[in-house]
């Protein structure tokens, strides 16, 4: 049975492995990951949860809540979601997204948004609609290490 629970510092190695496997834009630097993981767990506007089966982490979601003028209140953004290959097609992604949506609702978020390259059909299946193009700019001194 898979459970979704808040991430803990003890999950750092398994979440790092998932993040490193799924990163498409950056190489995940271990020292930077460790710092960011700890910050994310303690940041009140962030949500980090893991999917666990038989004491093994097979997925995670990282997201944030913040105010937005256009939404007349708070919005929530899924920054990262990853599910290990052996955990796919078992509802784990849906469970992680559902848990994030519950958290977002509890924070007063009026919408949940995300960007994806790999799973557009999955998000459409769970009620998301395509809304905008996604642009990014790597800031000077912070290339994709």
Predicted regions and their residues:
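Charged catalytic carboxylate motif
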Residues: 11-14, 95
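Acetyl-CoA-dependent GNAT
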Residues: 6-10, 17, 21-73, 79, ...
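Extreme N-terminal starter segment of soluble prokaryotic enzymes
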Residues: 2-3
